A protein has these predicted regions:
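Conserved class I S-adenosyl-L-methionine
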Residues: 1-36, 47-51, 68-71, 75, 130-161
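Conserved Class I S-adenosyl-L-methionine
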Residues: 17, 45, 180-254
Length: 254
């Protein structure tokens, strides 16, 4: 699904701390450097790609949203830092074996035909190449809050029975194409956002899984959720933040 409406706040809801972003760039560039051209699907505003490009990784970025790509160009100083393509991850506009590697962060759970997207990645990345995939990492209470919200208002139409933080089904899909799997070292991150702030974002409709819900119903659901969360955890603003681990899987293709 295109993220046109999220352009101006996307980085605020998906960004990492400077320390975690640097560690992620070091980790990914160590896997990608020397492999040749790398494709990132769902490149968005360049949260992953811009630091990788600065680290010397040759890239092509693809996204369904032209406004997101325009924001990437703006962040890069007004000129495309590498080739950018508006396109669909399930029908990649590239010939077979065009790339040596691919990067996928927080994308597959948004793609109804996500297994087709996996097949397309396997098609366009050459044998001996590499696909790096990361799902979402959020503190455990965020999972519970999100699930309870969806139980109240219904699942979004793009829901694909693949949670944003799930990796097991993705691993199985790549293995079905003969890929070998490696789990890369975890990157520690501390989420400073409180539950109250997360609920504020939910009420404001900043997350894709809230976009199909009528505003009045959304705000009523979040108001109920706040009361429930206080009963469940006692406070929506615990001190010190919460620790999460950023996980990447490497799929070596044959």
């Amino acid at each position: 699904m295109p993220f046109d409406r999220a352009v101006e706040y996307y980085d605020r809801t998906r960004g990492l701390s400077e320390e975690a972003s640097t560690a992620m760039t070091v980790l990914l560039s160590s896997e990608l450097r020397g492999r040749g051209r790398t494709l990132e699907i769902g490149v968005g505003t360049g949260l992953v790609a811009l630091p990788l490009a600065a680290a010397g990784v040759p890239l092509v970025g693809l996204d369904l949203s032209a406004p997101m790509l325009a924001k990437l160009v703006e962040k890069a100083g007004g000129r495309p830092p590498f080739p950018l393509v508006v396109g669909d991850a399930t029908t990649l506009p590239f010939e077979e074996h065009r790339f040596e590697a691919a990067v996928v962060r927080h994308v597959l759970h948004l793609v109804p035909a996500w297994r087709q997207a996996v097949a397309e990645l396997v098609r366009v990345v050459a044998p001996g190449g590499l696909v790096l995939v990361s799902s979402g990492q959020v503190p455990e209470p965020w999972h519970e809050l999100t699930d309870r919200f969806m139980d109240r208002v219904g699942r979004p139409s793009f829901a694909v029975a693949l949670d944003s933080w799930e990796t097991g089904a993705i691993v199985q899909a790549f293995r079905a194409h003969g890929a070998e799997t490696r789990r890369l070292p975890r990157i520690p991150e501390r989420v400073a956002q409180t539950m109250a702030e997360f609920l504020d974002q939910m009420a404001a409709g900043l997350h894709s899984w809230t976009w199909e819900v009528d505003e009045e119903e959304r705000r009523e659901a979040v108001a109920e959720l706040r009361l429930w969360a206080v009963e469940r955890w006692g406070s929506l603003d615990p001190p010190g933040g919460r620790d999460v681990a950023i996980e990447w899987h490497a799929f070596d293709l044959h």
